[in-house]
A protein has these predicted regions:
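Divalent metal-coordination and catalytic microenvironments
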Residues: 11, 16, 35, 46, ...
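N-terminal metal-binding scaffold of metallo-dependent hydrolase/deaminase domains
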Residues: 1-26
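Histidine/acidic residue-rich metal-binding segments in metalloenzymes
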Residues: 116-136, 140-292, 309
């Protein structure tokens, strides 16, 4: 399967790359995929597997990529955080990723857009690093907008992608203050603290910055109808912008926040209305949205459900890597919302193209042999005890899914088969961005 169609053929692999598609002839080893789908390994451009000086994620590179390869995700892009210099953040990420079971790349979160940070970008681009990330939801972004404009111009000149967390700080801060003043501290008020208007305002402001600076922007975790409308307007202007949604917004609504365990679904932005869910499916089907990224960042159940936490103190994030592909196939293809080709596009081909990861995302001669042998008829119920994340709950616990990865190959090596992790920590490699591809492709 490719994003352009399907064919019945052998796939020949040698030296970790695809060398033939068709009649591959004799081989030293055969994998029988008769009756199954042969898909390219998924590329997730949005994970949080790297540590910071003060925090180590529950799913680090080892645990997170165990879940990834079990779910057919062979390349992960993790956020790393500036530590004085941007390169110091990348170096920490490289140390963390020494135990990765999947291939990996980084986005550097820029928290202090100094002149020195700006001057680092050309060398980072030459070294093949994919891009940056900025958080519009922090007060720092507005306070230092002149510095961020300079950063965006430099990123554009270097051909780097800028991932954007697009929620307007003032809108979120005002809503949060009003809720606390009214004594509405409970987690069920979380959706009201981050209204969809915050996305709308931020995306439109970011689009103006993209027009001003020439920056290529990748809007992460879009959750609402108004966010989609703002993205559509930016694209209609010919700006270099891309849109990502995440699994939570495809399957769940804010009704989860009426439950006693509402905190388990706290993520930023929050879950929205049923109309938003349907709009996101339409945007994914029609091509307005380019990718689905997990924003994988789980926390233990006890940490999420601590009784003394107000809505804005609950640690945000959930586990999604292992269920990314099977959920999208089951809820998308099986329900007639998406074609298999479109699933391949949004989970593999487009993410690789957008990030400039030339060797990834396609089953084609010359590409890395990152392959998922997928059984479209295999039905299973999601149970946390069967998942490979270190998290002790799953946001889709009890969900019946039809379609599941049976075998995952990373650069031609079988790293997962029939429920067993076969890869070793450290098997993953850094994937360099191709300077001729990526942000403006």
């Amino acid at each position: 399967m490719t994003s352009g169609g399907s064919t019945r053929a052998d796939v020949g692999i040698e030296g970790g790359r695809i060398v033939a598609i068709g009649d591959a002839g004799s081989a030293s080893r055969d994998l029988d995929a008769a009756g199954l789908l042969v898909l390219p390994g998924c590329v997730d451009l949005h994970t949080h597997l790297a540590s910071t000086p003060t925090f180590t994620p529950l799913d680090d590179f080892e645990h997170g990529t165990r879940a990834a390869i079990a779910g057919g995700v062979t390349t992960v892009c993790s956020m790393v955080y500036q530590e004085g210099t941007l390169r110091a953040g990348i170096e920490r990420g490289l140390r963390d990723a020494e135990r990765s079971l999947a291939d990996f790349a980084f986005h550097v979160v820029v928290t202090d857009p100094t002149d020195a940070a700006v001057t680092e970008l050309p060398s980072l681009a030459r070294d093949g690093h994919t891009g940056l990330k900025v958080f519009m939801v922090t007060p720092r972004f507005g306070d230092r907008i002149t510095d961020y404009v300079r950063l965006l111009r430099a990123a554009a000149a270097a051909g780097m992608l800028t991932a954007v967390h697009a929620e307007d700080h003032e809108t979120v801060a005002r809503a949060t203050t009003l809720l606390h003043a009214a004594g509405h501290d409970a987690v069920r008020y979380f959706p009201e603290s981050r209204p969809a208007a915050a996305e709308d305002i931020a995306i439109r402001a970011a689009a103006e910055l993209a027009a001003k600076t020439g920056a290529a922007m990748y809007f992460v975790h879009l959750s609402s109808r108004v966010a989609l409308a703002a993205l559509a307007e930016a694209k209609s202007r010919g700006l270099h912008v891309y849109g990502e949604t995440r699994p939570l917004y495809l399957y769940l609504t804010r009704e989860r926040f009426e439950r006693p365990d509402a905190a388990l679904w706290v993520g930023q932005p929050p879950l929205r209305e049923r109309e938003d869910v349907e709009a996101i499916w339409n945007a994914l089907r029609g091509g307005l949205l380019d990718t689905v990224g997990t924003d994988h960042y789980p926390h233990l159940r006890a940490a999420k459900l601590a009784p003394d936490l107000a809505f804005d103190r609950v640690p945000p994030g959930v586990a999604n890597l292992e269920t990314l592909l099977p959920m999208l196939y089951s809820e998308g293809v099986r329900r007639g919302r998406l074609t298999v080709e479109r699933v391949v596009d949004v989970l593999a081909t487009s993410p690789a193209r957008i990030a400039g990861l030339r060797s990834k995302g396609e089953i084609a001669v010359g590409k890395d042999a990152d392959i998922v042998i997928f059984d479209p008829e295999h039905t299973r119920t999601i149970r946390v005890g069967e998942m490979h994340s270190a998290c002790d709950y799953d946001p889709f616990e009890g969900w019946e899914v039809t379609g599941w990865p049976m075998i995952t190959l990373l650069r031609g090596e079988v790293v997962y088969a029939d429920g067993e992790i076969l890869a070793q920590p450290g098997q993953g490699r850094l994937v360099a961005r191709d300077p001729s591809q990526g942000a403006r492709s």
